[in-house]
Amino acid sequence: MSKRKPQFDFWTIVTIGILAVFALFLIYPLISLFVDGFLEEGTGAFTMANFTKFFGKKFYYRSLLNSLKLTVCVTICSLLIGVPLAYIMSFFKIRGKSIIEILIIISMMSPNFIGAYSWILLLGRSGVVTQFLSNTFGIKMPSIYGFGGMLLVFTLKLYPFIYMYVSGALKKVDVAVCEAAESLGCNAIRKVFTVVMPLVTPTAIASALLVFMNCMADFGTPALIGEGYDVLPTKIYIEFVGESGGSAYFASAMASLMVVITAVLFLLQKWYVNKKSFTMSAMRPIQPTRAKGAKNVIMHVFTYLLVILSVVPHLVIIWTSLRKTEVQYFVDGYSFESYTKIFDTALSSIQNTVQYVL
C-alpha cells in the first residue's frame, strides 16, 4: 500500500512561514540570550560565574529586589484603581462616559518615559507645580525622583490595561446573576465581593500580568526619574553598554532572570485561569443606573480626577511644545517654532515611525 504524500496547499505554506518567523524572531533570540548568560567573557567557555556574581553581590541582586518591589506595588495600585473604575463605569451612569473612555485610551498612547518627562516638568526640582507651591505657599513638594515617582508614573500609565480588560469582562455578566444575589438578601457591597468579583477575577489577573510585564521591562521611566533607586533594566543597560568593565554575557544573565520570572508568573496565571475559567454569555447585559446623593458625587469626583491625572502628561507635552525656546531654555511667550523645526529636521523620523506602524 503506497504512502500518501503530504499535500502543500496555501494554508500549509502560510503556517510553515509563520512558524519560521516565530522561531527566527522569538525562539532564537531567547535561546541565544540564555546561552550567552552561561558563557565566560573572553573565552566563551561554559560557566556559572555570571549568576554567581549577580547573587553574590548586593550591588546587583538589590536591583532585582527593587524591580520586584516596584512592579508588585504598581500592579496592586493599578488593580485598586482599574477594577473600581471599571465597576463604576459599567454599573452606574457617569456624565461624559464616552469622552472619559476615549481619554483613558489616549493616556496609553505614549511611551512611559514621556509620562515621566511630563511629571518632571510639573513636579521636578524646577517644575511648574513645585515652584508655584514653594513661592506662593511655602509648601515643599516631595521629590518626584525615586520609588514614589516611578510608582505614580507607572500606575497612571498602566491602570488602563486593568480597566479595559475588566470592563470587557463585566459586559459579559448577566444582570440575572446580580438580581438573584439581591433576592437572596445580598447588599451592594456583598454582591460585589461574592458575585461580581469572582466572575472577573481571571480577567483581572490576566490584565495584572500585562501590567507586571510592562513595568518589569520598562527602561525609560527608571532612567529618567529612578534617581537613587536602581532597577534591573537600567543595570542591564549599563552593563551592556559600559565602556569600563561591562560584559554582554553578564547582561544576558541578568536579562534571562527577568525572562524566567515573567515566564513563571505567566504559567501560574495560565494554571489559575484554566482552573477557574468559565464561559458566560449575557442574555441581559448590565444596564447602568444613576446613583443618588453623596455616592453619585464621590464616583464622579473619583472618575474625573483619575482621568485628569492620566491625561496631564499629554497636556503638559502640548503646552511645552507651544512655548518659545532660546538655545535649550524656555522663555516667555508661545509660538509654533518647535513644530516648524520638526518638519525641517525630524520629518524622516515621523515617516519612519508611520512606516514601521503600518
What positions do the PLM features span?
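Membrane-water interface segments at the C-terminal ends of transmembrane alpha-helices
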Residues: F8-E41, G56-K171, L199-F219, L224, ...
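Flexible interhelical linker loops that connect adjacent transmembrane helices
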Residues: S2, Y272-F302
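Glycine/proline-centered hinge or cleavage motifs at structural transition points of membrane proteins
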Residues: L184-C186, P198
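Glycine-rich helix-loop "coupling/hinge" segments at transmembrane-helix boundaries
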Residues: L121, F219-G245, V327-D332
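Juxtamembrane helix-boundary/capping and inter-helix hinge elements in multi-pass membrane proteins
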Residues: K57, F92-R95, K171-A176, C186-A188, ...
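Helix-loop-helix hairpin linking two adjacent transmembrane segments in secondary transporters
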Residues: Y237-I261
